[in-house]
Regions:
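Bacterial Sec-dependent signal peptides at the C-terminal "C-region" and cleavage site
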Residues: 16-24
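N-terminal secretory signal peptides that target proteins for export/translocation
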Residues: 1-3
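N-terminal secretory/targeting leader peptides
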Residues: 23-117, 129-355
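Bacterial N-terminal signal peptides
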Residues: 6-17
Length: 355
């Protein structure tokens, strides 16, 4: 054992690492916005915890706490910043009240698809901007999973014109809520546990959640027959957060383990959600023929796009960094979208109907 430890000491000294004795166990806690049972949103933290334990031989333990434990679903950033928890899992758009620039690391209406966004994050300037935005919180942020393109929501009545949006009571948070509000929608943000009852009783007329994999479990189809395709969250990225000081104290190999595990868990969650939604969509079409799947008419979509641009331009006029990130994303998306139209959409369009 002594000879093995001596070898490790030599390796750390040579390569500038930080030595952790074979008897030391590093224990971290991770707080997430979601209940522990809400898969696949809650899947990435557990995946990271399992991978880290296995890769470190049980010497690096990350204990995962769902919101049922810490009771502060929207307090994750503050808890990680203040080192109540070394890590957190949430979504960046929840911190728009602290810094509007955080929205760019979740999604924006009419923005990039999941693959386009990951390409921007990892092979464009995305991670550079993420670091810049989160530095002020003394927190490191990393991609933490993705729901893919989300559905546009459940509606009690059909939306045929822009006028139909006026006076509509809808649960739709974040930037999309601001966009809808400009078109006369009465926007509200109701906790997930109250959504079904609110829709059933007519407290709200419509809501957006995620997609068929999660929506059918909530039972929305029982009280709102119109299910609209999306526009507002073309790629909804989650995030891991790490307290900067806690991270800096880690040995280099543990830092590498963390980055590897987070990246793997992030990709796995996207695949898990896609698979779950594909199965749920097929089952939904068979079991609930009363559901009317719709897309918003072109005039409504144009109004939503115009409203989106106005909201973004409003923030850009007051915030130089916001404007810079927006321009950077648009430039990247211009190239990425051309390939998306060929690589996936082109294939589907070309082979559609071929048996």
């Amino acid at each position: 054992m002594k000879s093995i430890i001596s070898v490790w000491i030599w390796i750390y000294l040579v390569f500038g690492g930080i030595f952790v004795s074979a008897n030391d166990v590093i224990k971290w806690k991770l707080a997430m916005t979601w209940p522990s049972t809400l898969k696949p949103l809650a899947s990435p933290p557990f995946k990271v915890s399992e991978m880290i334990k296995e890769m470190s031989g049980g010497k690096f333990i990350i204990e995962v706490h769902g919101k049922e434990k810490h009771k502060a679903a929207l307090g994750i950033l503050d808890m990680v910043k203040n080192k109540q928890y070394e890590m957190g899992h949430s979504t960046s758009i929840y911190w728009k009240g602290k810094d509007i620039n955080t929205i760019w690391f979740t999604t924006v209406p009419f923005g990039m698809t999941t693959k386009e966004q990951y390409a921007w994050l990892y092979y464009g300037d995305g991670m550079k901007y993420m670091k810049q935005v989160y530095d002020r919180f003394k927190v490191l942020s990393f991609p933490g999973g993705n729901t893919g393109s989300q559905m546009g929501g459940w509606f009690r009545k059909e939306i045929k014109t822009v006028e139909d949006l006026k006076g509509l009571k809808m649960r739709i948070p974040g930037l999309a809520g601001e966009v809808m509000a400009r078109l006369g929608v009465n926007v509200t943000n109701i906790p997930g546990g109250e959504l079904y009852t609110s829709l059933d009783r007519g407290t709200i007329d419509a809501l957006e959640w995620v997609g068929p994999g999660m929506d059918i479990k909530m039972g929305f189809h029982k009280v709102a027959p119109y299910y609209y395709t999306g526009w507002h969250e073309p790629s909804s990225e989650l995030q891991f957060m790490i307290n900067k000081k806690a991270y800096e104290k880690l040995p280099d190999e543990y830092k590498s383990m963390l980055k590897t595990a987070m990246k793997a868990a992030s990709a796995d969650m996207y695949i898990e959600n896609f698979a779950e939604s594909a199965v749920a969509w097929d089952k939904m079409k068979q079991d609930y023929p009363n559901i009317k799947v719709k897309s918003f008419p072109l005039p409504v979509m144009k109004a939503l796009k115009k409203s989106t641009d106005e909201v973004l331009e409003g923030y850009a006029s007051k915030n130089e960094l916001f404007k810079e990130i927006w321009e950077n994303q648009k430039e990247f998306m211009k190239k990425a979208r051309k390939w998306s139209l060929i690589e996936e959409y082109g294939y589907i369009k070309t082979t559609l109907g071929v048996e």
